[in-house]
A protein has these predicted regions:
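Structured cytosolic domains appended to multi-pass membrane proteins
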Residues: 1-106
């Protein structure tokens, strides 16, 4: 079921991303699949900004995929998209294909 990304669960998402990045081998890109996010509040946008900045400091790009229109509008109004170190992909598969050459060179 679709959910909101908001103050109560945004920190969980942040912790989960960094647990996964730090637990694995070298990571160059993180893709956050947003298909189930139907609403996002300002604190969640701020959390995404923090995730984007921290990943950038680690040399990792943050990408988004399958972002719904209203969520994309909120991210655009908050100027998050201009700060995003990666790309916004229409579909998760598109992100995979776009990033595959980078992964193959690693």
């Amino acid at each position: 079921p679709d959910q909101s990304l908001y103050f109560a669960n945004a920190r969980f998402v942040e912790d989960h991303i960094f647990d996964r990045v730090q637990a694995g081998g070298p990571v160059r890109d993180v893709v956050l699949m947003c298909a189930a996010i139907n609403e996002i509040d300002l604190s969640a946008v701020e959390t995404l900004e923090t995730i984007n900045t921290r990943l950038d400091e680690m040399g990792v790009r943050l990408h988004l995929s399958e972002v719904k229109g209203p969520v994309m509008d909120r991210l655009r109004r908050a100027h998050f998209l201009s700060q995003l170190t990666g790309e916004v992909h229409l579909a998760q598969y598109d992100a995979f294909v776009a990033l595959l050459p980078d992964a193959a060179r690693a």
